Amino acid sequence: MMATQTLSIDSYQDGQQMQVVTELKTEQDPNCSDPDAEGVSPPPIESQTPMDADKQAIYRHPLFPLLALLFEKCEQSTQGSEGTTSASFDVDIENFVRKQEKDGKPFFCEDPETDNLMVKAIQVLRIHLLELEKVNELCKDFCSRYIACLKTKMNSETLLSGEPGSPYSPVQSQQIQSAITGTLSPQGIVVPASALQQGNVTMATVAGGTVYQPVTVVTPQGQVVTQALSPGTIRIQNSQLQLQLNQDLSILHQEDGSSKNKRGVLPKHATNVMRSWLFQHIGHPYPTEDEKKQIAAQTNLTLLQVNNWFINARRRILQPMLDSSCSETPKTKKKPAQNRPVQRFWPDSLASGVAQATPSELAMSEGAVVTITTPVNMNVDSLQSLSSDGATLAVQQVMMAGQSEDESVDSTEDEGGALAPTHISGLVLENSDSLQ
């Protein structure tokens, strides 16, 4: 395969370069000189295009073998070849320079534009090769980390499963530890005394409650030291471990029970404390963060539970109280305007008499003067303007005074059953004088 082949500058000789040019059937560029040309150029082709001429100039350039070699290295690096590096290309450049100097061949042609194109193309491919090398290093680093993580996980699973063939199985571990410390009781856990004095001990347990992994000591300075088992060891009985395990399980059960209680209905003591605070601060029932922490400490609840309780209390306790208090207060309703009938305060004869009477004035004592001007063409509809409270009161007083005075002066008018229209104006004037 191409990815496994080793490339060198020798694989791009002038014979292959000439073969490429011959296969393309292009003629030599007059601006570039071929070092191996014998001075005989092929006959010019009339159908040659500028693109073909540019291709021929590139293939005839002295730096073309180096460009082709770099391009092949980039392809191999893209395919994942491990032998392609930027350092190897530096060696290839040195070999190319030595070979060109040894053969006496030039590095450039007589066309500066083509020379500049070749140099920039080599630079671009070199940068591309460096970037591919960085990507390859990152991939290798990721693969190594991933493999190490898998190995660690597999070792831990093998250690916990206690397979007979694994290096951490009880049989294998007993043989290793017996070779170091003699005999080892399978009922206990072996811990070196020096490890307990220096720092924490990292141990791994397997089925049966026995530790078979070598002891790793973590010093107070953070250094990890692995120590071999020594004869002076401390044996911890399985009964003590079982007791410790039972205590841990009981603590876990208690925590689970307390968490379940908190998730359900809150304790009555907690609700009483929060309810009392709510009614004490009913004007502004929004506790601060410090107050929430204090309430949570008193009620043995979390801040989230306290916050949720106050949110629900403001909506379910305070809001119904406010709604009920607002419903008890009497609501003032605007009285609709009523169309009072024309003959509510006076008979038909009085209304017809007022319509034909001359203008008159009504005056009340104590400065409250009500002036009523009644033109001759006043109709019944215009009397509706007198239906206000002040005008109605004045008309009632005038009528009552006129009726009392009329009864004392002349009793013959009562027999007619109605007041004469001609006496209305005089009655109104006399009553107004008497009121003054």
From Swiss-Prot:
UniProt GO cellular component terms: cytoplasm; nucleoplasm; nucleus; transcription regulator complex
Chief site of localization: nucleus
Extent of Acidic residues compositional bias: 404-416
InterPro entries attached to this UniProt entry: HD (IPR001356), Homeodomain-like_sf (IPR009057), KN_HD (IPR008422), PKNOX/Meis_N (IPR032453), TALE_homeobox (IPR050224)
Source superkingdom: Eukaryota
Keywords for this protein: Activator, DNA-binding, Homeobox, Nucleus, Phosphoprotein, Transcription, Transcription regulation
Compartments where found: Nucleus
Region Disordered, residue ranges: 23-50, 401-436
DNA-binding region listed in the record: 259-321
SUPFAM superfamilies membership: Homeodomain-like
Domain MEIS N-terminal: 80-163
GO molecular-function terms, A-Z: chromatin binding; DNA binding; DNA-binding transcription factor activity, RNA polymerase II-specific; RNA polymerase II cis-regulatory region sequence-specific DNA binding; sequence-specific DNA binding
Role noted for this protein: Activates transcription in the presence of PBX1A and HOXA1.
SUBUNIT field: Interacts with MN1.
Protein's name in the database: Homeobox protein PKNOX1
Gene: Pknox1
